[in-house]
């Protein structure tokens, strides 16, 4: 099971509400639109992949603009 520290992702985005919006949009891009993940998948769900991308600074606020 993947271990994601949400606090690290919140620090990258600024607040938890925007984190939810950004992670959901990125997860949809990966799952429905077929976008390639920017981190190794490791059999994780798209939501976990999105959070890992945010945590590593690969995805940010620009996705909701």
Swiss-Prot record:
Gene Ontology BP terms: DNA-templated transcription
InterPro entries the record matches: DNA-dir_RNA_pol_omega, Pol_omega/Rpo6/RPB6, RPB6/omega-like_sf
Record-listed E.C. numbers: 2.7.7.6
Pfam families (UniProt xref): RNA_pol_Rpb6 (PF01192)
GO molecular function ontology, one term from the record: DNA-directed RNA polymerase activity
Enzyme class of the recorded protein, top EC level: transferase
Listed GO CC annotations: DNA-directed RNA polymerase complex
Reactions that this protein is recorded to catalyse: RNA(n) + a ribonucleoside 5'-triphosphate = RNA(n+1) + diphosphate
Keyword terms of this UniProt record: DNA-directed RNA polymerase, Nucleotidyltransferase, Transcription, Transferase
Function of the molecule: Promotes RNA polymerase assembly. Latches the N- and C-terminal regions of the beta' subunit thereby facilitating its interaction with the beta and alpha subunits.
HAMAP family: RNApol_bact_RpoZ
Subunit record text: The RNAP catalytic core consists of 2 alpha, 1 beta, 1 beta' and 1 omega subunit. When a sigma factor is associated with the core the holoenzyme is formed, which can initiate transcription.
Family, as annotated: Belongs to the RNA polymerase subunit omega family.
Protein name: DNA-directed RNA polymerase subunit omega
The organism of origin for this protein: Baumannia cicadellinicola subsp. Homalodisca coagulata
Gene: rpoZ
């Amino acid at each position: 099971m993947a271990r994601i520290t949400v606090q690290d992702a919140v620090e990258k985005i600024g607040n938890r509400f925007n984190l939810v919006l950004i992670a959901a949009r990125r997860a949809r891009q990966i799952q429905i639109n077929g976008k390639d993940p920017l981190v190794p998948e490791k059999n994780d769900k798209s939501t976990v992949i999105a959070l890992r991308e945010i945590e590593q600074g690969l995805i940010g606020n620009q996705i909701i603009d």
